[in-house]
A protein has these predicted regions:
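Short, acidic, small-residue-rich periplasmic hinge/interaction motif at the N-terminus
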Residues: 1-9, 29-31, 39-41, 77
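N-terminal periplasmic accessory domains that precede
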Residues: 16-19, 58-63, 73-75, 81-109, ...
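Extracytoplasmic beta-strand/coil segments of soluble accessory domains associated
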Residues: 17-53
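Short beta-strands and strand-coil junctions in structured, solvent-facing domains, enriched
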Residues: 52, 79-83, 142
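Short loop/turn motifs that connect adjacent beta-strands in outer-membrane beta-barrel proteins
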Residues: 99-104, 185, 241-248
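Membrane-embedded beta-strand positions of outer-membrane beta-barrel proteins
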Residues: 106-110, 135-137, 190-192, 249-253
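Extracellular/periplasm-exposed beta-strand and loop segments of Gram-negative cell-envelope proteins
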Residues: 111, 146-153, 159-173, 198-210, ...
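Transmembrane beta-barrel wall of Gram-negative outer-membrane proteins
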Residues: 116-142, 157-203, 226-240
Length: 279
């Protein structure tokens, strides 16, 4: 099953996770996690290649990646021999958008929402002589708020924990493809991709204790949980088309790297005095 993003208005302006929801047998949750044919461990590829940024923290990435950046998503439970068959249930593949000389040389996108949520993107499409140059960039800023309450009762009484947290992910995604026609049947291409997701996160946990029917403040916990994910890739391709256009030879060399760093700083505050008692 394949879904062409630019011909589907409900997926055109969304994220990659939004588009996956349009595929049968695929379920995504609010955190971007994917379940495919009952398994939460499908293989995730970009242009048929496994990327580090889609491995351990793939859910976080999929709810940030702009859908139109990839143009097409596809799924298969029986991947071909040309794909790395990781995953318990099959393969979900993201295909980069392909632009030709017939397409606009410059495309600009802009979106905005409530609570300072917005995104902006640009596509540069040039084909001078035998060269094919396509560069894409997208910036996305979001706001997330989480609130929950938990009560624990034991012999010493009831403890109530109220947790309020907010996060502002800043996401940059860029790639550049430069192709050259060696012959009418041979195209060589160099490709690079860079992704940066930088979270600014703060949480405030308010612990109270209910003793003899009276609610007593115990502690405020301030949690500073900033997060940074950075990935880059370099790729070289050779595509040869034989006399029969259906016969092709594709050679791809890809190197990609992924890094993740998360802070977990906290300070415990005594509500009555405002004094920091632990950090």
């Amino acid at each position: 099953k394949r879904l062409q993003v630019d011909s589907n208005l409900s997926g055109l302006t969304g994220t990659t996770a939004d588009v996956f929801r349009l595929l049968p047998s695929v379920v995504t949750d609010i955190e971007g996690g994917i379940t495919f044919r009952g398994s939460n461990n499908p293989g995730l590829l970009i242009n048929g290649v496994p990327y580090g940024l889609l491995e351990e923290y793939s859910g976080d990435m999929l709810i940030q990646l702009p859908a139109l950046f990839f143009d097409r998503v596809s799924m298969t439970s029986t991947p071909s021999i040309g794909l790395v068959p990781d995953g318990d249930a099959g393969i979900l593949n993201l295909s980069s958008a392909v632009y030709t000389a017939a397409d606009s040389p410059l495309v600009l996108t802009l979106g905005a929402g409530f609570q300072e949520r917005y995104n902006a993107g640009a596509i540069l499409n040039l084909h001078p002589g035998k060269f094919h140059i396509v560069g894409k960039y997208n910036y996305r800023r979001e706001f997330r708020k989480r609130t929950f309450s938990k009560s624990t009762t034991n012999k010493g009484g009831t403890t109530v924990m109220n947790n309020n947290a907010s996060a502002r992910p800043d996401v940059h995604l860029a790639d550049l493809s430069v192709g050259y026609d060696l012959t009418a049947n041979d195209l060589i291409t160099v490709y690079g991709l860079y992704n940066l997701m930088d979270y600014s996160r703060y949480g405030k946990i308010h612990n109270n204790k209910l003793v003899d029917g009276n609610l007593q403040p115990v502690m405020f916990r301030h949690r500073y949980n900033d997060q940074r994910q950075e990935a880059y890739a370099a790729e070289a391709r050779w595509n040869h088309t034989f006399d029969n256009p259906k016969d092709r030879l594709d050679v791809v060399f890809n190197y990609n790297n992924f890094g993740y760093d998360e802070d977990n700083e906290y300070k415990n505050e005594k509500p009555e005095t405002g004094k920091i008692i632990a950090e």
